[in-house]
Amino acid sequence: MAKEINMNIKKCNYKLTNLYYGLVFSGYVLTLVINGFRSGVFAALLMVLIAAITGIFAIKSDTKSDFISLINVCVFAYIIYNFFSFVWIMKNGFPLSVFVEEFSNSVLPAVFYFVPALIIKTEADDIEKEKITDSIYKAFIVAFTVFSIISIILYITAPQFYCDYLFNMSFISKADASTCRVRMESFTGSTSISYLGVAAMLVSARFMYKYASLLSVNKTNDKNKNNGDTLKQFIIYSALFVFSLIVVFLANGRAGMVAALLVIVYINILVFSVFRFADRKYLYIEAGAIIALIVILCIITPSIVSKIWARLVSLPGAIGQRSEQWVSAINNMYGQWFGNGLGANGHKAIGIEGAKVVADGGLVKLYCEEGALGFSLFAFIILVIVRQSFKDLKKYFSELGIIMTALLMSIGSNIIAFQLCMPIFYFALGVIGADANGNAKEKGELKEENKCG
């Protein structure tokens, strides 16, 4: 009976995690037609539900002792540390609402770390684990693609009701079509859609590599009958990779475009140099195709190319402009060890006396709010996970990319404090963390067997 209950809890967690981005994206679309619909509150409630289901499963599991590991304890401690920061944020004169919103946006998504760490890990079969992980990634990319198609249609047509919506949401300064088309704001803002596009590129690359590997194996084993479906899947995810890249450039965010270009370089280095998976001639073909595309765009739409180039080359100057804001925020911290409290340097604190808002620079903002202790704990978690990813880069290159691009973009933007972006970030951390815990346990069991022998 208990085993059946655990199985039902686990299935419920799978389904809710699979549906999460689809439901949240639907919530954002609903804000267009339902005035006053709180998409952020809706997303927070879903995360609380996922946290509750995951926690119940962990408590009822027969192997819950397996989940007590250094990295899992550190992530849990990080959540608790930030939760109790409401004490010093209120002590520093900030209202509780500032803390609640920031906790919901940047820390509550950490529950997604425990989905693979506590749920997927219980599957004894590695193949079954991979299937579950793949299903969650596929659900994310399907939801993102549908959401992006709706966004692109509205961006291109720019109907007046959509322009009014963007103006009311403070995404644009004037409710007309020309202002609407400066960048694709979607329903979430251009920064969020940029990072999600980069994450979708990396998820697509995961499946491209998977199906390309299957094609290679089938060719070696003369299993040509299986090549049709595998090739179809490879083409689909290649198209999704390109589509996600286009979405990032339509969003017209500097950090997003740079991250997308770095992802292309990263994937090519892995495929042609690290993994040595493909012949170099394909690299030359790809380079030729990219050059040809740029030349064609320069001929057909030179204004778009010059606009993108101007955005990219302005990145160093933008960082220089924001550095003064960062230095001011750090120099005016209430306490170096514990920080100002979660939310004290966020947008919600604008207008509060004594607040030093870090409008762009998520990592600096995180340091100011969490202090040396909280930020060191966060950095330790990242370092442990990244170190583990390098032990099996073929398996984790997608997750590593999702993590590192979020950190890279958080130098000049507040990606790390965006509620919509953080679930995929923490899920990627959890996928690597779950296997790190499993490998440590296997090594321990092997040592015990050797002692007995």
Question: Predicted segments — roles?
Answer:
Residues 1-61, 80-92, 406, 427:
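N-terminal signal-anchor transmembrane segment
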Residues 1-21, 59-61, 220, 224, ...:
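A juxtamembrane structural motif centered on a specific transmembrane helix
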Residues 21-25, 52, 202-207, 265, ...:
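Transmembrane alpha-helices of multi-pass inner-membrane enzymes
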Residues 73-76, 80, 95-121, 135, ...:
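Aromatic-anchored transmembrane helix interface
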Residues 134-164, 186-252, 257-270:
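Alpha-helical transmembrane segments of multi-pass inner-membrane proteins
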Residues 153-159, 251, 268-313, 331-332:
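A membrane-periplasm/extracellular boundary helix in multi-pass inner-membrane enzymes
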Residues 185, 247, 355-389:
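A conserved mid-to-late transmembrane alpha helix and its immediate loop/hinge
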Residues 304-370:
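Long extracytoplasmic/lumenal interhelical loops at the membrane interface
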